[in-house]
Amino acid sequence: TLNRNEDIATTGKRHAYSFDYKIGVDADGKILAYEVFLYQQAGAFADISPAVLGRSFLHTSGSYYIPNIKVSAVSCKTNIPPNNAFRGFGVPQGTFAIESAIHHIAEKMGVDASEIKFKNLLRDNDTLPYGMRLEKTNALRCWETLDKQVDIAKRIAMVKEYNTTNTKTKRGIAVIPVCFGI
């Protein structure tokens, strides 16, 4: 058996990713097009990396309707132990890419990211990038239920107010819809 130091030095971790993207939106914040290139850190050899990358690939649109999408990806061999499957199995990495893009859009437009997210949520009869038509989706209903229960805009305002009056500590808030599985 390995001691803890040997175990940490020789076993894989969650796959680290980098990504480059271009995203196009209209004046109202509706996403029109999204192009993303994912770089996956596989480690010394592939192991389970191709399957994890495949899941990331399928989840780069998150829970949003994006009419025009192009996804490219590469698994990079690096000088570390091979990475392994972890909870989420590539979905968090693909989701992180689109969520980051949405936050950048919101910042440039001077609105909260939750506004952009709500406008682009998957709705009944939307089609996913790989051709699956959603006859019925609960994304919008879940968002609206959450908003009724916690008043998203009010909580965001409370966080902003706290952050403007406190210099040493800050708070954050996020709402992230997750689409998992196909």
Whereabouts are the PLM-identified features?
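Conserved active-site and cofactor/substrate-binding residues in soluble primary-metabolism enzymes
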Residues: 61, 93-100, 111, 134-141, ...
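Flexible loop/turn segments at secondary-structure boundaries
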Residues: 6-10, 41-45, 123-128, 182
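Glycine-rich loop/linker segments at domain edges
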Residues: 16-101, 179-181
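General beta-strand structural signal in soluble alpha/beta enzymes
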Residues: 1-2, 32-36, 118, 177
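Predominant activation on well-ordered alpha-helical scaffold segments within soluble catalytic domains
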Residues: 1, 22, 67, 95, ...
